[in-house]
């Protein structure tokens, strides 16, 4: 089994070169071919001698794994199915818009968080992705050249696979890598003790926190992770960081009918986030099997948006994309696909 070069840092690629008796600068050449030119085969690295390319190819490969399925929505959204190193599969969603194109990537197969409203959690946890698995979703995307933004909002909890998420974002933002600005990348989280702080310290990417209720007891019924790191503790941690400049903080809030769409909730949100430089994205609930929840109506969402905005929190209602292909928020799951392919 050959080792993928995709996902390796510049230091690691230099070490690969040294271990094979090549000059250290060859590692830099490899990095440019992979992250700059996006080659599919080591043989394409033409400024490396043929002998060294052959030596490299004996033990290593680029690590490209093409998608095995693509579903197209009427709104232009495309959901791809990618294989990962473990033999499982993840879904990745390409969301084109007028002046931007966003890719929603997965970081785990399934998820441990088991949020009441999310189909991925119903799948259970089947393993974390490697950095190569994460980056392959971008590297092998047919529309990769069109991308303007990446969001870690697909399957899995990024803080539960933090080493590989940080490695992937390092490759994406480093000068020797994709050289993207960190402000083109948003990483979401329910809030995981210790891991969230490490992410905030080691990354400059935007952060999105799953809020869904400002009332701790209610949030715990929606999100078991509340019992591990409560939303008050999450907000207290966030207050230690500066989000007034390049880095952006947002809160995701799925609006459920009769559950979290009242003015009581609106006032509690304002009180919870008072003085914090942030924005809120209100999200429509997309029905999943056996979830005793309904989406709030448009008018209530507009009232909630207007109240929060009037009280100093910039708030938007997120447009639902890809709902007809089960690519919208909370609908990603590969369990049935895996069982069918297996």
Predicted features, each with a name:
Residues 1-90, 239-247, 255-342:
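Auxiliary Fe-S-binding modules of radical SAM enzymes
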Residues 132, 136-144:
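Ferredoxin-type iron-sulfur electron-transfer modules in oxidoreductases and energy-metabolism complexes
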Residues 86-95, 99-100:
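P-loop NTP-binding catalytic core
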Residues 142-149, 154-318:
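Conserved AdoMet/S-adenosylmethionine-binding subsite of the radical SAM
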Residues 73, 106-107, 188, 210:
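Short linear Ser/Thr-Pro motifs
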Residues 78, 90, 101-105, 113, ...:
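Generic beta-strand structural signal
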Residues 96-133:
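Canonical Radical SAM [4Fe-4S] cluster-binding loop centered on the CxxxCxxC motif
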């Amino acid at each position: 089994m050959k080792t993928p070069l995709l996902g390796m840092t510049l230091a690691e690629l230099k070490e690969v070169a040294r271990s094979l008796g090549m000059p250290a600068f060859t590692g830099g050449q490899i990095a440019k071919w992979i992250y700059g030119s996006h080659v599919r085969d080591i043989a394409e690295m033409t400024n490396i001698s043929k002998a060294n390319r052959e030596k490299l190819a004996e033990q290593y490969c680029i690590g490209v794994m093409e998608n095995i399925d693509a579903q197209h929505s009427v709104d232009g959204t495309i959901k791809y199915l990618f294989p990962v190193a473990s033999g499982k599969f993840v879904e990745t969603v390409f969301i084109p818009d007028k002046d931007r194109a966003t890719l929603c990537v997965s970081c785990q197969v399934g998820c441990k968080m088991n949020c009441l409203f999310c189909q991925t959690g119903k799948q259970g946890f089947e393993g974390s992705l490697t950095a190569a698995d994460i980056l392959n979703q971008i590297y092998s995307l047919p529309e990769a050249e069109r991308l303007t933004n990446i969001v870690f909002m697909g399957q899995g909890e990024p803080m539960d696979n933090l080493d590989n998420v940080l490695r992937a974002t390092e490759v994406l933002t480093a000068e020797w890598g994709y050289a993207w600005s960190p402000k083109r990348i948003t990483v979401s989280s329910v809030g995981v003790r210790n891991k969230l702080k490490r992410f905030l310290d080691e990354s400059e990417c935007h952060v999105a926190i799953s809020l869904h209720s400002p009332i701790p007891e209610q949030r715990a019924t929606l999100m078991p992770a509340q019992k591990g790191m409560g939303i008050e503790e999450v907000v207290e941690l966030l207050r230690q960081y500066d989000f007034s400049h390049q880095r952006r903080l947002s809160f995701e809030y799925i609006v459920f009918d009769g559950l979290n769409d009242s003015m009581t909730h609106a006032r509690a949100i304002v009180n919870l986030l008072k003085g914090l430089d942030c924005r809120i994205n209100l999200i429509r609930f997309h029905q999943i099997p056996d979830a005793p929840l309904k989406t709030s109506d448009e008018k209530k969402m507009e009232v909630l948006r207007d109240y929060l905005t009037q009280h100093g929190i910039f708030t938007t209602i997120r447009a639902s994309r890809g709902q007809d292909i089960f690519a919208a928020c909370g609908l990603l799951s590969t369990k049935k696909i895996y069982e069918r392919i297996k």
